[in-house]
Amino acid sequence: MGGRTVRPLRPARRAPSSSAAADATARFLDALGLPAHVRDSEDLADTPRRVAEAWLEDLVDGYARDPAEILAGGLPTAGRDLVAVTGIDYHAVCPHHLLPSRGVAHVAYVPGGKVVGFGQLVRLVDALAHRLVLEEDLARDVADALVHHLGARGAACVLEAEQLCMTVRGEKRSRARAHAEAWAGSLAKDGPARRRFQQLVAREEAGPGRGRGAGSRSASGSRSGSRSPSSLAPAQRRRKSGRGGPTTR
């Protein structure tokens, strides 16, 4: 059977190597067949090092973060009210063309005995997004992490993203946006909590505060409020709200 021979992939390195990544970037630039005055210009002199740093420190640094550790140390609670953070900006890299995507994530869960700070949800999204990942897999990874590592009774993640795979190549549709949703546990079924989260997402996407982030704690949709998705210490959260108890958010 005819066809070109594909060289086997090298085994993955045990640890990231900035020098190896920089060398590979330099070889990639050589392989592009750029005009000599471009390839030898001062603009590209330090590009391999900068590219290696950008990838290892900003684009695929999520592989060094453990979702289980991020969600560890939750506060015990007997409550089952919806907890949500909307408008979480994130970026990821498409594994097909190694082009970035940039989007907004909305995350919610129904506690199964523990709650975590809003900031931990933001860090969870970053840890799972800063990888080579498709949007639909990212949404599922976030929801699954909340169920498996936090013990949430239900979890959901809704994403909207601009993918350069669609906007600068291929179909080249600059206004196209990718949407992905994942629902797990009790939120996989229609009910008050799921509908409340959908309302929060719709409000975030339609309102002037889009992308700024809003935290919500709601019992049957009776209470919600915009706030920064930063993580406050338990004592600070209790003082801020003026109420005691481990479930104060």
Language model feature labels by segment:
Residues 2-213, 217, 223, 227-249:
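A domain-level signal for the structural core that forms small-molecule/cofactor-binding pockets
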